[in-house]
C-alpha cells in the first residue's frame, strides 16, 4: 500500500476540534485502505454508491458506522436499510417516507440529514430553504417512527475563495 492511510488520518484527526467526528469518505477506495483506517480507530465511513457500499459492508468489520452521502433514489433505499446508520442527503418527503417504510421492515430507526440546496449549480440536489421550512411545519414527518431527523446537510458552490 503506497498511500499512508494511518499517517494521513492522524494529521486530519489532530486538527479537528474536540467533539467533532470524522466521516471518512471511502468511495472508490479499496477495502485495505478502509481496514487501515479502521485499525487506527476510524469507525464512520461514507459511501455514495449503494452497490459498492453493500460489498464493503459485507466484508469489513461489523461495528463500522455506514453513512450514505450522495443522492439516494427511493428505489435504492431497500438495499441499504438493513445496515445503514445515517442517510445524509434526504431531499424530499417522499424519500423520507420510503426510508421510514424500509427501516420499519427491519425494526430499525435510521438517522437522516435533510439536504438543503444552497449552491449555484443546478446539478446539486436538495430542498429549497422554503420547502424545508414547509416540510417541517406541516409536521407529517412526526408520524414517521423509523427515521430520526438529526440536522441539515448543505453543499456550497465550489469557488476560488
Language-model segments: residues:
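Conserved alpha/beta-domain cores
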Residues: 1-161
